[in-house]
């Protein structure tokens, strides 16, 4: 990558995340449901500490990455009223490090390139439900993705030992039903990134991989883009996180009947509880890529948003 373009990429992602960080989600555990360390991409995390005592607050980063949702964690720190912005990827893995190199706060970088996953960052020093704020921006020139979003707030005081006092507890998320739509395949390619959540505290405390699991069902029907239903049941198992495509929710016959013009599927996720992995819901993210047939300047752009639950 040319240095000038790389600097522009970094500036764009940093500017987006620093702007978005002001007044965004606040809690002592923040969940960021999607990051990437793909070659040439930058995922940039921005955190701020609104606590005033003590001056330096311990942070616990828990990365969950790859098909196996592998656990990687370490401790960082954040001084009072500071803004810490840094690349998710370590400099050795293609990241640029801290936005301000002289910042005395200590981030935890992810050491591997070409990975995707989700991240939980928790405050460990101050027993407060609003000391930690944060957001993430992602710029990926290969896929065309440019997005900034706030971390998801669990509103629990998470001080103390790792995994205790509500750290990683997202059992309040009980989203199970999602009406998923797909635009015509000739103009947009659609994928979904599902993250299974629940109370992850015990798993975090043990330093183990989160194995929250369950199955998606299409509830026996899918619809084409003109409301015609086609029956057939598909069950899709998911453990921790998964990238899903529209055909994961359809039989071969249903997919052929719906055709290339897009459609609707009303999915339901059924959690499977096996202690200490106790899932309660799903965070579903939709990723749409505009295809070359659309033409410039839109072709090659990628859009990401969190899907709203409810049927």
Predicted ranges, named:
Residues 10-18:
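Hydrophobic helical h-region of N-terminal Sec-dependent signal peptides
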């Amino acid at each position: 990558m040319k240095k000038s373009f790389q600097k522009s990429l970094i500036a764009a992602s940093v500017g987006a995340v620093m702007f978005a960080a002001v007044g965004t989600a606040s809690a002592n555990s923040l969940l960021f449901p999607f990051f990437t360390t793909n070659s040439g991409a930058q995922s940039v995390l921005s955190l701020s500490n609104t606590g005033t005592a003590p001056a330096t607050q311990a942070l616990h980063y828990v990365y969950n990455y790859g098909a196996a949702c592998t656990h990687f964690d370490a401790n960082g720190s954040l001084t009072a009223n500071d803004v810490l912005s840094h690349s998710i990827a370590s400099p050795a893995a293609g990241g640029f490090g801290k936005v301000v190199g002289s910042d005395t706060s200590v981030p935890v970088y992810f050491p591997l390139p070409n990975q995707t996953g989700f991240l939980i960052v928790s405050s460990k020093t101050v027993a407060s439900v609003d000391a930690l704020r944060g957001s993430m921006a992602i710029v990926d020139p290969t896929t065309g993705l440019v997005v900034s979003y706030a971390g998801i707030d669990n509103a629990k005081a998470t001080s103390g030992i790792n995994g205790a006092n509500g750290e990683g507890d997202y059992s309040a998320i009980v989203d199970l039903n999602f009406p998923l739509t797909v635009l015509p395949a000739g103009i947009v390619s659609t994928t979904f990134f599902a993250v299974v959540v629940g109370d992850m505290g015990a798993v975090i405390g043990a330093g183990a991989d989160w194995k929250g699991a369950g199955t998606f069902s299409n509830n026996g029907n899918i619809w084409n883009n003109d409301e015609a239903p086609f029956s057939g049941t598909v069950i899709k198992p998911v453990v921790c996180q998964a990238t899903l495509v529209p055909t994961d929710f359809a039989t071969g016959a249903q997919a052929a009947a719906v055709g290339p013009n897009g459609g609707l599927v009303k999915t339901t996720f059924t959690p499977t509880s096996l202690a200490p992995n106790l899932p309660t819901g799903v965070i579903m993210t939709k990723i749409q890529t505009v295809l070359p047939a659309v033409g410039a300047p839109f072709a090659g752009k990628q859009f990401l948003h969190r899907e709203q639950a409810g049927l």
